[in-house]
Amino acid sequence: MIEPHAPAPPGSPPSWGGPCGPEAPARLPVRPAVGRFLVLAGVFVCAACGLVYELELVALASYLIGDSVTQASVVLSVMVFAMGLGSLAAKRLRGLAAAGFGALEAALALVGGSSAMLLYAVFAWTGGWGGLWADGPRILLVAFSLAIGVLIGAEVPLLMELIQRVRRQDPGGAVADLFAADYVGALVGGLAFPFVLLPFLGQLTGALLTGTVNAVVGAALVLGLFRRDLTRRARWLLLTANAVVLALLATATVLADDFERAARHAVYGQDVRVAVRTGVQEVVLTGDADGRPLDLFLDGRLRVRGSDERSYHEALVHPAMGGPHARVLILGGGDGLAAREVLRHPGVRRVDVLEADPGLARLARHDPGLSTLNEHAYGDARVRVLSGDAFHRLRATPSATYDVVISDLPDPGVTASTKLYSQEFYGLLRRVLAPDGRLAVHAGPVDARPRAFWTVDATLRAAGLPAVAYRVGARDTGPGPGSVPGPRRAAAGPPAPRGWGFLLAARTAPAPRLDPAAPRPHSLTPDSLARGVREAARTQMAGLPPSTLVHPRF
């Protein structure tokens, strides 16, 4: 596939190609040194835009489809492969390097800039079709990765041709200069995406703005610096193409907010009552009107379902409160619902809620629907909200600080939460627990994903916290609180769990029981708890290795 090239005879002039003749240098409106600088500046900007396109696809795919490690691997590997194809294809354009580069950048700006909006549209309006289109969003993700990769890969050979036409240079030095500008541009794009574009503009507008910058710089470089090498027809074609691309991107930018609202209604239904982006995630509340129960979605995944959240939170909290419980730590639980159940027990003096997203805790405190559901738990003086990384917080926490720890975290299968189900993390929890303290862990649906559930059990035991498993059934087959199978309209995802699985751990294997001094739970009884222990035991898988930071098992 890669064609061999014979070395040029000593003293022979370079083969420039291009419309001005095979050996003619570019006719520039500026001095060669300035022209060379402008080409390298264009390389810098195009590299930054290219990396933003890659990161935007990874981020959006992780949000829409889930499993960020898999999505990053798919996008990056497909894109790098496509870049190789683009480099080979660009050899046919070397004779028309200026016109080819101008057309290439216009196409890349349109495809890359619109990719986030088109991918989100397919997910929102066709994600529930199933059948032959069950993997539609995944197919489109691969298609965009291929297209963007081919276009990015074709840039370098054409830019190499252009920079050599500006001023002849030793090929090794030209490649070094070109790659230096390319890599520095990629650094700037890689830092701009998470720290500027994503928090201030969002994924859709950020991608559209990147496409606009890409189109403007590409057109300016070709139509400004190399315009004398273009025919009149080529100049008008490039000018028209870039004007159309910029008009499309500008129109999409103006309509981005309306599009996002329409897509959100397509995903969640028409009863969206709150939709906010915190500094960490998108939080959506639906229902709580005309008798419809309130549902809470975090980054598109159902986290709380008002119709049966009480069954989940009672099963998570009450068995752990069967012993000393004056000092309680809740991991996650920013919605305040686990804190609500903790505060029902007499003798509780302190409740620390360690939530990675303080914006969610603020919403749970101030939103009328959610604060009513959590019975205004954050208004209790005993409750304190802590934010930040759980690892860092626990490392700085003195030993034996808490009598009870409640782990109200997403399923271990969600990549971002995997480290919070590791042996190292449970070792930190063991240290902060009092000698007779208890740890309750939501470990995912034991029926649907037994291997992941019992891996959590093996990890707890490896950390010196033997556990007793129990399950509680949901009232229907849909995903409920604490389960994170993926966005509601995900085209393909794990099966919806029929119940929730929990592990109650301590330094010595505890006996799950309810606190007789506490108010009676609404749905959990001693008999149902004992039955849940027996049902979970029937699914036990022995001999599983623990999950660690360097070797996650989920």
Swiss-Prot record:
Annotated TM spans: 37-57, 69-89, 106-126, 139-159, 184-204, 206-226
Coiled-coil ranges (or none): none
SUPFAM superfamilies found in the cross-reference section: MFS general substrate transporter (SSF103473), S-adenosyl-L-methionine-dependent methyltransferases (SSF53335)
Enzyme category, top tier: transferase
Enzyme Commission identifier(s): 2.5.1.16
GO BP terms, alphabetized: polyamine biosynthetic process; spermidine biosynthetic process
Membrane topology: Multi-pass membrane protein
Principal location: membrane
Annotated segments matching region Spermidine synthase: 235-516
Keyword set includes Transmembrane helix: yes
Keyword Membrane attached: yes
Domain PABS: 247-492
Reactions performed catalytically: S-adenosyl 3-(methylsulfanyl)propylamine + putrescine = S-methyl-5'-thioadenosine + spermidine + H(+)
Region entry Disordered, spans: 1-20, 476-495
Keywords: Cell membrane, Membrane, Polyamine biosynthesis, Spermidine biosynthesis, Transferase, Transmembrane, Transmembrane helix
GO MF term list: spermidine synthase activity; thermospermine synthase activity
Gene Ontology terms: cellular component: plasma membrane
Binding, S-methyl-5'-thioadenosine: 281, 355, 389-390
Residue ranges with Pro residues bias: 1-13
Subcellular localization: Cell membrane
Binding residues annotated for spermidine, in chain numbering: 313, 335
Biased composition, class Low complexity, residue ranges: 485-495
Family: Belongs to the spermidine/spermine synthase family.
Function noted in UniProt: Catalyzes the irreversible transfer of a propylamine group from the amino donor S-adenosylmethioninamine (decarboxy-AdoMet) to putrescine (1,4-diaminobutane) to yield spermidine.
Subunit and partners: Homodimer or homotetramer.
Protein name: Polyamine aminopropyltransferase 2
Source species: Streptomyces coelicolor (strain ATCC BAA-471 / A3(2) / M145)
Gene that this sequence comes from: speE2
